[in-house]
Amino acid sequence: VFSKRIYKNIETPKVHDIEVFYFDMDYVSGQNFEEFFSTASVNDVEFVVLTLFEYFDTLISTARNVDASNKILKKIDSLKEKTSYPKYIEFLRKYVEDNRIIVPHTFCHGDLTFANIIFHKNRLFFIDFLDCYVDTFLSDLVKLKQDLYHLWAVHNQDVYSVRIHQIYQYIWDKLEVRYESFMNESFHILDAMNALRIEPYLTSERQNVILES
């Protein structure tokens, strides 16, 4: 579906063959996030920022508001048995039950972290799409916050550097300012849900800060 959409400077490798346990797709020349941002120029970083702006602005231009409360409640119920924060789960459930959670309905990548982008000087290649329990660009913003603000992939892959941290902080600040009007209760609910969804993968004190913030 994504490959049929038009986003400025964003592409996805063409998939040729899909089997049960694997798929074949075009080879894409580019760099992972650590390679790219370790040597990125100011212009390279601005290119990434502007390309993300174009992506989200395009999604917003066709958005329509929908009530996502039932889908969120269903997801909350699926997390009950897996969490070490049962009281927080109950708090979230009651909050969603008492308040309609309205989100802008759009396409979303489903797992838009920088680990799922191949970086090129004049292109970003999105890979590893996932189904999203709530189809909204807010879900993509939440995943970017996971990477840019909480430094999830950087710490997970043990490639932290002050340079990358500063670049990520800059990119997230830009996104936060541009989409400030969407950083509302719906965004914060989805953000909290994302932290609970990745809780089983939080294996260190450094990673657990995602749940505590």
Regions found by a protein language model. Name each.
Residues 80-106, 166-184:
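Alpha-helix-centered segments that form part of catalytic cores
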Residues 2-9, 28-73, 85-100, 105-108:
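Conserved kinase catalytic-core helix
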Residues 66-70, 183-193:
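Acidic carboxylate-rich catalytic motifs and surrounding loops in phosphoryl-/glycosyl-chemistry enzymes
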Residues 13-22:
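Short beta-strand micro-motifs within the conserved protein kinase catalytic domain, predominantly
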Residues 31-32, 133, 152:
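Feature marks short, surface-exposed loop/turn motifs that line or immediately flank catalytic pockets
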Residues 139-179, 192-208:
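Active-site activation/catalytic loop segments of kinase-like enzymes and analogous catalytic loops
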Residues 93-139:
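Active-site acidic catalytic loop and adjacent metal/ATP-binding pocket
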Residues 21-42, 189-211:
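A glycine-centered beta->alpha junction motif in the catalytic cores
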